């Protein structure tokens, strides 16, 4: 059968896939999905995050009466949210997507589970083509381009949602610290993060992940330094996640000592700015 999965009245795609588990072991189902619907299959669900904003989005009554309004306009949502809500999306939720060599997939899924316990995960294969640009294959950073494109099989892992311990009521879960640990491992593997998600790296760490050689050549050639922002300055969050590291470290110290004395303030209840402003 042909299944136009992006139709407003249809179940959100990840829920449709989840429903395949009900077929039973050894059962299979084949469908034909129009190309555009397939390419846009995660748009209505906002990569599985819509349930956090609109819990009724997958209910039949909502899909048939108001499903035509999905997905919400992301520019509008981002432009109208207050600072406290922006802090909440950094400290109490995760919006991350990484690409890394395919052979490391099992390791990274295990790490995502140990650090965050967020499901479902978004996973799909991708081909990385090294043409000497900002995305290079492991080991090629800073090396002159040979003129011959190199390719490698990578896997993409999207982690979108609320960490398990936060759902269970943990008010002192060190989300930023844990995401940074995952970022660090991705860098070690020669992978990279998708910059439409929140970037928790420092600028030095970001430059390890992406090859800036040609970009720096162009900056020098056109004397752009000081006139235009760096790539990192363009993509980093407007609210600095690194500003929360010291507080999260204090939670870990207090937990190891078995004392809550240093837990001065719960996340989301104070105004936080960039480092040095608190």
Q: PLM features: residue spans?
A:
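Activity-critical C-terminal alpha-helical subdomain
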Residues: 75-84, 89, 147-150, 166, ...
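C-terminal substrate-recognition/cap domain of FAD-linked oxidoreductases
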Residues: 1-177
């Amino acid at each position: 059968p042909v299944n136009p999965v992006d139709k407003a009245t249809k179940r959100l795609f990840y829920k449709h896939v989840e429903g395949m588990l009900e077929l039973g072991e050894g059962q299979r189902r084949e469908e034909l999905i129009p190309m555009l619907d397939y390419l846009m299959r995660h748009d209505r669900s906002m990569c599985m995050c819509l349930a956090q904003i609109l819990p009724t989005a997958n209910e039949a009554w909502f899909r048939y009466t108001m499903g035509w309004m999905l997905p919400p306009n992301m520019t509008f949502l981002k432009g109208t949210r207050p600072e406290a809500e922006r802090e909440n999306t950094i400290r109490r939720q995760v919006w991350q997507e990484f690409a890394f060599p395919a052979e490391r997939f099992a390791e990274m899924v295990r790490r995502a589970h140990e650090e965050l316990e967020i499901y479902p995960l978004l996973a799909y294969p991708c081909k990385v083509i090294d043409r000497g640009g900002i995305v290079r294959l492991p080991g090629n950073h800073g090396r002159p381009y040979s003129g011959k494109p190199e390719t490698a099989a990578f896997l993409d892992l999207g982690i979108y949602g609320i960490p398990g311990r936060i759902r269970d009521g943990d008010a002192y879960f060190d989300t930023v610290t844990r995401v940074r640990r995952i970022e660090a491992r991705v860098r070690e593997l020669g992978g990279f993060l998708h910059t439409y998600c929140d970037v928790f790296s420092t600028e030095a760490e970001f430059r390890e992940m992406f090859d800036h050689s040609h970009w720096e050549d162009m900056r020098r050639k056109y004397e752009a330094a000081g006139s235009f922002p760096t790539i990192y300055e363009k993509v980093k969050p407007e609210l600095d996640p690194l500003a929360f590291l010291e507080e999260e470290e204090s939670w870990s110290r207090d937990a190891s000592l078995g004392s809550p004395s240093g837990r001065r303030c719960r996340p989301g209840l104070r105004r936080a700015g960039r480092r040095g402003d608190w």
